[in-house]
Amino acid sequence: MRVKLTLACTECRQRNYNTMKNKKNDPDRLEMKKYCPFCHKHTLHKETK
């Protein structure tokens, strides 16, 4: 089952990206290094609800 989720920057807390994940394959919270347009740099983005 694929679910929609939002990725938030860990430094400025802005919700920058929407994505989907398969809960069966990834039961833990998703973490990715992505570009944050508000910080103007690559930062760690974590899954939010």
From Swiss-Prot:
Coiled coil: none
GO molecular function, one term: structural constituent of ribosome
GO CC annotation: cytoplasm; ribonucleoprotein complex; ribosome
InterPro entries referenced in this protein's UniProt entry, alphabetically: Ribosomal_bL33, Ribosomal_bL33_CS, Ribosomal_bL33_sf, Ribosomal_zn-bd
Origin: domain of life: Bacteria
Family according to the record: Belongs to the bacterial ribosomal protein bL33 family.
Matches recorded under NCBIfam families: PRK00504.1, PRK00595.1, rpmG_bact
Protein name: Large ribosomal subunit protein bL33
The organism of origin for this protein: Clostridium acetobutylicum (strain ATCC 824 / DSM 792 / JCM 1419 / IAM 19013 / LMG 5710 / NBRC 13948 / NRRL B-527 / VKM B-1787 / 2291 / W)
